[in-house]
Amino acid sequence: MASKEEERTGQRPSISMYDPARDRWEEQPVVPAEPASASASIEATPTQTSEAKPVHDSTVTSTSESLHLPQTTTIEPSQQPEQQQKQPPIPTPPSSQSRRKHKINKMGDYYRSGSADAYAEQSSPAADSHKRKLEDETSEQQPPADQANDRPISKRKRLEERHQKLRKRGQAPPSAYSRRDGDETAARAAPRPRSPSPPLPPRSPSPEVQARQRKRPGGGARRGLVDPQTLRRRQEERERALEEDAMRNSQSRGVTDIVRQHYNAVPQRGREWRKTESKIKGLRSFNNWVKSTLIQKFSPDEEFEKRLLVIDLGCGKGGDLGKWQLAPQPVDLYVGLDPAEVSIIQARERYAGMRSGRGPRGGRRGGPPLFHGEFRSKDCFGEWLGDVDIVQQVGIDPNVGPGGSMMASRWGGGGFDVVTSMFAIHYAFESEEKARQMLRNVAGCLKKGGRFIGVCPNSDIISARVEEEAKAEWGNSIYRVRFPGDTPEDGIFRPPFGWKYSYFMEEAVGEIPEYVVPWEAFRALTEEYNLELQYRKPFMEVWRDEKDDPELGPLSERMGVRDRTTGELTMTPEEQEAVSKYTPLGFTSAEGESANGTGFYHAFCFYKV
């Protein structure tokens, strides 16, 4: 039967006992009193009990202690408080500090004695009194036994305590991986018998060669053993290539500079001098009439509604300002570009004179007001025009031509209605790069449906003269053409770029370099930039076709191109020979595509599609 204490607390009494196998204190329940049948065995002497059990069995020692505990008896409720005061206190487990101290002393005695007998003495009843004394001292500091019983020591805590012991001894605790893979590691670490390597084949004796030359440090060692003549030849080739590149670049810069310097040096003689004292006044008048014819025929658009935006590539001194003022469709903006700075200054002065001589609105009495003019010094063929401020404001398309966006080049475009270049594009055929840059500027400035008009030398006439005459030079007292080198025997210029000749024109052009413009090559290039040929005729054909026009015929008389009474041209035979060298530029029907020997200059017109 359970005692009253058990009924009151709900727990059985227990006692703290030291377990050397686990190296800790454990709580053991107090064994209740046995019936009379078992009393004989309980009343056995301690000597007999100690002889029957092993020395290391701590359970026997603790059991012998429990035998001396008083037997539980039934107590009346009135006597219960008094009985509880007389009952001895239940021993509680010592604190962790006391445990550690007691454990160290006990284990130290055990190892000092070197035998299990010393440890048995520590576990004897004589030592239990010391144990109970420690328990009594620390009973007030420890929690009740029933709470200690509820928190068993986990496996992880036991491992941590074991690792702490190993660390105190200076040993590293084993990791979980080493414990898990102990057998595998040992198996891998076991030496394995290796098969002997096959013997190496005997080396053949090296043939006797000359002793290797010692290399001195420096560039000679890095170059290797090369013949000095080879090194000298390579150096000469490199120097020759550098000289050719430098000469080519200087020539390219030199041509542009020569042309710029020449036109900057041409004096401004005035309109009266050109009409009365000039030796080539008839030729000048004829060339101006052909340019006016191009402007009158091809500058207006189909709608003929809004005012035109015009850009002139190679405007010179502004000689065409008056022609654009008389255009059939009024001009709103004229932009003049030229590489010669002095020519741009003179063009500004001419434009300022036009404004001051035509009233406050800048136009003649009864005529249209003078357009707004902008002038800039710019290489129109070797540089991109997109960095010119006024061109940016009007609009320029950078995606035209090969390599650009197809949609942008097809549907995009610039803001100008007309691009004009009179007696200038032959300077762009110095190289293919310049020719393409010129066409990129033209196509980029033009809007869809815009016109590109101009005048250039007729390559068909030049080819015919080169094929007929062995000496590539011809002219008279008015003009002269001379090729500095050999010319093609068949008259076909291949490649189509860089065929330079020097051209001289009395009172107009000094001995400056120009370049042949092979017409078919030029036309093929224009197609890559969405320019379609509409008109092309030599100068003399333009005269024969337009001299009887109701507007252009009287204009030729006013400009002094033909006599009012006879109707004949006022040019001398030498001037007519000079004018047959060029043809006005304008792309048109197939009949006018081939020059028939009637003009050294020809005119053209392209449409932007």
From Swiss-Prot:
It is an enzyme of class 2 (transferase). S-adenosyl-L-methionine binds at residues 291, 314, 338, 379, 422-424, 427. Disulfide bonds: none annotated. Residues 28-47, 70-87 have a biased composition (Low complexity). MRNA binds at residues 287-288. It holds the Pfam family mRNA_G-N7_MeTrfase. It catalyses: a 5'-end (5'-triphosphoguanosine)-ribonucleoside in mRNA + S-adenosyl-L-methionine = a 5'-end (N(7)-methyl 5'-triphosphoguanosine)-ribonucleoside in mRNA + S-adenosyl-L-homocysteine. Keywords: Methyltransferase, mRNA capping, mRNA processing, Nucleus, RNA-binding, S-adenosyl-L-methionine, Transferase. PROSITE patterns: RNA_CAP0_MT. The record marks 317, 323, 350, 426, 514, 601 as: mRNA cap binding. It is found in: Nucleus. InterPro entries: mRNA_G-N7_MeTrfase_dom, RG7MT1, SAM-dependent_MTases_sf. GO terms for cellular component: nucleus. Residues 1-252 are annotated as: Disordered. Responsible for methylating the 5'-cap structure of mRNAs. Belongs to the class I-like SAM-binding methyltransferase superfamily. mRNA cap 0 methyltransferase family. This is mRNA cap guanine-N(7) methyltransferase. It comes from Aspergillus niger (strain ATCC MYA-4892 / CBS 513.88 / FGSC A1513). The gene is abd1.
